[in-house]
């Protein structure tokens, strides 16, 4: 009897091709579409252009998934995780922004929704032997590796998964490039073959970000201060709307050199900036991260690199394991390492693990202004 795989179908080209590839590998494929956000239940009105559209993007995605399931002759079911997403992903996102950090919701969406609640339904209700997702990544024996297509590799977003979760997962796109996936879809004439990739917040979609956050956090305007001269150089609409290293959207004109964001003071509602004459305010060479989730059973401590944000080039590091799942990571001068973001550590193509950046240092001094 064929093994049953419950596949997360999003209505996009990646999961559509996954369904076909799993069929070709002899699996019995069951599609499961997740609905994790409700704009009306979640008070998502400001910045949400989808409200006024004739067809909700989420409903269009479901219609596309149904069409592909029909083309491939596989069953497709629908499941709602709206409350779970709010409790485990979105609430965390808002709380992080409130304390001045820059979170990455995709990481916790994977940890709690796609590979936890989704998996529970797949295994208990639909008797799955495995679950599958359209991520560009590779796993073997509970360990996680980068995908073939480095430009699309999503192992960064999966570094909070456990070995037990990974043992029950199939990533059919591990050894394909995005172009190859598109070609397969076009050759099969799948309904999603030319559909553009989704962007925006995981399961929420594209939003006008400043207006979107105002649904949940009141905007608190304040001063923009040059951290080197201590002079007021402008005003901002709320520190939560700016990220470390940001250069655009500051509305600071009339200066000989452009400014970039280097930090903030929440209590004083101050956004700190610097120009290229003072790069040290943007640089760091050490960090402390919390909640380290080790995936690799073994790794070479002399061959480690890391990403501090998605699609960043891997940077050589030195890793020190501390107590209470904390890690200390040292590296050469690097710009815009940001608390709240995830650091993912690699041994070559193998994912060693991931943790959330908590404190950042430069020349043994903690950067207290970020």
Swiss-Prot record:
Q: Where is this region: Interaction with tRNA?
A: 152-154, 309-310
Where found, per UniProt?
Cytoplasm
Q: Kindly list the positions annotated as binding ATP.
A: 8-15, 34, 134
Domain of life, source organism: Bacteria
Q: Where is this region: Interaction with target base in tRNA?
A: 104-106
**GO molecular-function terms, A-Z:** ATP binding; tRNA binding; tRNA-uridine 2-sulfurtransferase activity
Q: What EC number(s) has UniProt assigned to this enzyme?
A: 2.8.1.13
Tell me the function of this protein. Catalyzes the 2-thiolation of uridine at the wobble position (U34) of tRNA, leading to the formation of s(2)U34.
Protein name, as recorded: tRNA-specific 2-thiouridylase MnmA
Q: What species is given as this protein's source?
A: Metamycoplasma arthritidis (strain 158L3-1) (Mycoplasma arthritidis)
**Gene name linked to the record:** mnmA
């Amino acid at each position: 009897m064929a093994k049953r795989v419950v596949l997360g179908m999003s209505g996009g080209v990646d999961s559509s091709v996954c369904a076909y590839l799993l069929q070709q590998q002899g699996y019995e494929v069951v599609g499961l579409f997740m609905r994790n956000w409700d704009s009306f239940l979640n008070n998502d009105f400001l910045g949400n252009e989808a409200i006024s559209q004739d067809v909700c993007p989420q409903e269009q995605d479901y219609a596309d998934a149904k069409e592909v399931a029909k083309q491939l002759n596989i069953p497709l079911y629908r499941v709602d995780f709206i409350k779970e997403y709010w409790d485990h992903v979105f609430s965390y996102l808002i709380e992080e922004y409130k304390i001045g950090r820059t979170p990455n919701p995709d990481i916790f969406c994977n940890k709690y929704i796609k590979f936890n609640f989704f998996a529970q339904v797949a295994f208990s209700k639909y008797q799955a032997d495995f679950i599958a997702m359209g991520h560009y990544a590779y796993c073997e024996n509970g360990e996680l590796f980068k995908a073939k297509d480095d430009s699309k590799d999503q192992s960064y977003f999966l570094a909070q998964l456990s070995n037990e979760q990974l043992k029950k997962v199939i990533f059919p796109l591990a050894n394909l490039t995005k172009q190859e996936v598109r070609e397969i879809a076009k050759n099969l004439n799948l309904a999603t073959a030319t559909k553009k990739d989704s962007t925006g917040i995981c399961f929420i979609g594209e939003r006008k970000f400043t207006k979107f956050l105002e649904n949940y956090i009141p905007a608190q305007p304040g001063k923009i201060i040059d951290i080197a001269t201590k002079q007021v150089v402008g005003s901002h609409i709320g520190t939560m709307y700016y990220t470390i290293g940001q250069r655009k959207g500051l509305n600071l004109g009339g200066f000989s050199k452009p400014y970039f964001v280097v930090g903030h003071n929440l209590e004083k509602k101050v956004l700190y900036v610097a120009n290229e004459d003072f790069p040290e305010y943007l640089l760091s060479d050490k960090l402390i991260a919390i909640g380290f989730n080790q995936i690799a059973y073994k790794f070479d401590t002399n061959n480690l690199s890391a990403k501090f944000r998605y699609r960043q080039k891997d940077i050589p590091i030195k890793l020190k394991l501390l107590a209470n799942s904390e890690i200390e990571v040292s590296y050469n001068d690097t710009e815009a390492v940001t608390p709240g973001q995830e650091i993912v550590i690699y041994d070559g193509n193998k994912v060693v693990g991931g943790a959330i950046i908590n404190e950042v240092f430069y020349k043994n001094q903690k950067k207290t202004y970020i």
